[in-house]
Structure formats: structure tokens, C-alpha cells
């Protein structure tokens, strides 16, 4: 009898052990069994049932969330910018729900990036894209997450170069508004409707937008006012708009400061003696060539546009002031040469008259006053006398032109600055 009891106990232990092994095996392969059961009758060619069960023919709602990881290479010439982002889409596919399958303690979600090719994915594309790629190092930077109720989260890391239609009328005081759109390529609004995540539609990695060399990201707005209507139907669209403010401090140092100094240097010509032709011409030509070179260098960084920019007004005015200084000397030199020609003719006429008078006069003793040369000493003018001579209005017309130019031209440049900067501030305030 004892032998029978021992055999019975051994049998019970063996059955219990095999049952425990079976439960452990079932727990270890639970996710695999869930996936096999979900995909057994799944057809990726058919879109999921509508999100709104009350409308059996309604569209699938795809909720979108974007995280901007990097913003760089804002190219004004090609009107484009580059950014790296994490693009997330979320939708409900009731065919993938596994809460009702009866598994004990099912997982909170299934992370299954390897079955992407077996699932229905929204055919989202970016209309403003010029170039883009997904990151594959060390593996494909994406994941798929399936929740018990059938909610699917698809996330992917993308680098994209997108076009941005820039308005450069206020360059370099401009604000740029760059639109980033996403649309379904094949499904109309009867099949897919996009909506932004109401909690956080766009997220920024810390530091993004504040480390750009010439711009600063000041604002991000989202909307859905970009629905595309074509002859094949209406396609839902979402839009993210980036507001980029150009950093003016760079252009103050590299553009406005140097050009202002060139204009001021050209005014030195008004203080140089009108008979110093070589010095005044060399100064005028040098400043004019420098101004032209700077203008060409600045325009090389901009696209050829058909409208006038505020920087064109500034450069044109500076070049006008520099060229005007050179023309002023040309006019002064011409007036001086005309005056000297008239004086030479007058002296020649007086000399001829004196010669004729000498021939008619009878020689007579002429009185010579005693020499008083030793009574006078050489006089060295003081600094005050020299300063007074510079600021005393002359009677000679060419010198009078130089005199007025010394004061009128700087005042004219100051008046231009007042009008220019006031107009710029008014136009910029209308954009903000």
C-alpha cells in the first residue's frame, strides 16, 4: 500500500510541475500569441473602422504631435530651412484591440516596430518638403505601440529640409513666417481627418531656436486652415507655423556701422584744400569703390527679388552721399579753373596795358620810400586763428561751396537716418 501511495504522490507532483511549466511558458509568449491572434485576420490594405462609431462610414481621426529636436541652416538665398523632429501619429484601430481576448494581466501596451510593414499606417506627406530622410543608425529610429483598446502610436525621427516663402522687403529687420504642412496623399477627408494633440501639439527640445546664428525662433502656432482642394477631392491638412526673427545686432556691426563710417570718411574731402586734386580724387574714388564692393557682398547673400528692400534704400542712399561728395569736388574744381582762367586773362590784359603806358610816359625820377622790411616779423597763426579761418564763410564761390557742404551734407545724412529708421520701426510694428 505504501508503494501505491508513493506512486500517487509522485504523479500529483509531476502533474503540478507540468502545469506550472505550462503557465510560465504561456506568460513568456503572451505578447507573441497576442500579435499572432491580432494579425491572423488583419488586412493592412483596408483603413481602420471610423473613430466615431455612430457614423459607420466616417473617417479615421489621426492625432498628430511633433517634437522639434533641432532647427538649423536657415538659407535665405534658397528660401529653405532644415530641422530634425520626432513625428508622432496616433489613431484608433479597433481590429488591434486585445483587451477582450481574455488574457490574464495583459501588457499595458505592445511595442512592435518590426511589424510596421504588416499594419495600416497613415499615408502622411509634407508638401513643403525639399529633402528628407529617416534615421537608421544604429537601428531604424521609429516605434509602433499598440494599446489594449486598439489605440496605435507611431513615432519616427526625421530630418527634413523644407521650403519657406520669405518676404524680404524689411530685410534685415524682417520677420519670417515658415509654414510646415502635413497632408494625406491618397485619402480624402472622407477617409482621414487630422487633428493636433490638444495637450501639446508641438514640443521644443531645450535650447532649440535660441542658438541660431542669424535668427531667433520667437513663436510657434498650429492650425488646420490649409485643407487642400483638388480635382480628386479634398484632403485634410495640419499646419505648423514658425515665426523667425532676424538678429539685428549682426547687421548693425557688419552692415550699418561700416557703411556709415564710409559715408563720414567721404566728408573729409570737404575740408581738404580744393587745389589738392590728387588727395580729394583719391579719397572720393576709394570710398566709392569700397561702398560698391560692400553693396555687392551684401546682395550676394540674398536671392534676386523683384522688389526693393529696406537695405537697398540704405545702401543706395549711402552710395549717393559718397558719389555726391565726389561730384561736389568736380563742380568745385571746375568753378575754380574757370575763375583762374578769367583772372589769367585779366592779368594779361593789365600787363599789356602797362607796357603800352610805359612807352608813352616820359622818363622821370620816381620816389622810392625807405625800406621798412626789418620792422615786420614773421607771424605764426594760432590754432584759434586757423579754426576761425575754416569756419569763416569765404567770398570765393568754389570755397563757399565747400564751406556749405561741410555742414549741409552731414545734416542731410542725419535727416535721412531719422526718416529711414522711423519708417522701418513703423513697418516692423505692423508685422508684430
From Swiss-Prot:
<dbReference type="Pfam" id="PF02931">
    <property type="entry name" value="Neur_chan_LBD"/>
</dbReference>
<dbReference type="GO" id="GO:0045211">
    <property type="term" value="C:postsynaptic membrane"/>
</dbReference>
<dbReference type="GO" id="GO:0005230">
    <property type="term" value="F:extracellular ligand-gated monoatomic ion channel activity"/>
</dbReference>
<dbReference type="GO" id="GO:0034707">
    <property type="term" value="C:chloride channel complex"/>
</dbReference>
<feature type="binding site">
    <location>
        <position position="69"/>
    </location>
    <ligand>
        <name>L-glutamate</name>
    </ligand>
</feature>
<keyword id="KW-1133">Transmembrane helix</keyword>
<dbReference type="InterPro" id="IPR018000">
    <property type="entry name" value="Neurotransmitter_ion_chnl_CS"/>
</dbReference>
<keyword id="KW-1003">Cell membrane</keyword>
<dbReference type="InterPro" id="IPR006029">
    <property type="entry name" value="Neurotrans-gated_channel_TM"/>
</dbReference>
<keyword id="KW-0406">Ion transport</keyword>
<feature type="binding site">
    <location>
        <position position="184"/>
    </location>
    <ligand>
        <name>L-glutamate</name>
    </ligand>
</feature>
<keyword id="KW-1015">Disulfide bond</keyword>
<feature type="topological domain" description="Extracellular">
    <location>
        <begin position="300"/>
        <end position="306"/>
    </location>
</feature>
<feature type="transmembrane region" description="Helical; Name=1">
    <location>
        <begin position="250"/>
        <end position="272"/>
    </location>
</feature>
<keyword id="KW-0407">Ion channel</keyword>
<keyword id="KW-0869">Chloride channel</keyword>
<feature type="disulfide bond">
    <location>
        <begin position="164"/>
        <end position="178"/>
    </location>
</feature>
<feature type="binding site">
    <location>
        <position position="155"/>
    </location>
    <ligand>
        <name>L-glutamate</name>
    </ligand>
</feature>
<dbReference type="InterPro" id="IPR036734">
    <property type="entry name" value="Neur_chan_lig-bd_sf"/>
</dbReference>
<dbReference type="InterPro" id="IPR036719">
    <property type="entry name" value="Neuro-gated_channel_TM_sf"/>
</dbReference>
<dbReference type="InterPro" id="IPR044721">
    <property type="entry name" value="GluCl_TM"/>
</dbReference>
<dbReference type="Pfam" id="PF02932">
    <property type="entry name" value="Neur_chan_memb"/>
</dbReference>
<comment type="function">
    <text>Glutamate-gated chloride channel subunit; channel properties may be modulated by the formation of heteromeric channels. Glutamate binding triggers a rapidly reversible current, while the anti-helmintic drug ivermectin triggers a permanently open channel configuration.</text>
</comment>
<keyword id="KW-0472">Membrane</keyword>
<keyword id="KW-0770">Synapse</keyword>
<protein>
    <recommendedName>
        <fullName>Glutamate-gated chloride channel subunit beta</fullName>
    </recommendedName>
</protein>
<keyword id="KW-0812">Transmembrane</keyword>
<feature type="transmembrane region" description="Helical; Name=4">
    <location>
        <begin position="403"/>
        <end position="426"/>
    </location>
</feature>
<dbReference type="GO" id="GO:0005254">
    <property type="term" value="F:chloride channel activity"/>
</dbReference>
<dbReference type="InterPro" id="IPR006028">
    <property type="entry name" value="GABAA/Glycine_rcpt"/>
</dbReference>
<feature type="transmembrane region" description="Helical; Name=2">
    <location>
        <begin position="278"/>
        <end position="299"/>
    </location>
</feature>
<keyword id="KW-1071">Ligand-gated ion channel</keyword>
<feature type="signal peptide">
    <location>
        <begin position="1"/>
        <end position="18"/>
    </location>
</feature>
<keyword id="KW-0813">Transport</keyword>
<comment type="subunit">
    <text>Pentamer.</text>
</comment>
<feature type="topological domain" description="Extracellular">
    <location>
        <begin position="19"/>
        <end position="249"/>
    </location>
</feature>
<keyword id="KW-0675">Receptor</keyword>
<dbReference type="InterPro" id="IPR038050">
    <property type="entry name" value="Neuro_actylchol_rec"/>
</dbReference>
<feature type="topological domain" description="Cytoplasmic">
    <location>
        <begin position="328"/>
        <end position="402"/>
    </location>
</feature>
<keyword id="KW-0868">Chloride</keyword>
<feature type="transmembrane region" description="Helical; Name=3">
    <location>
        <begin position="307"/>
        <end position="327"/>
    </location>
</feature>
<feature type="topological domain" description="Extracellular">
    <location>
        <begin position="427"/>
        <end position="432"/>
    </location>
</feature>
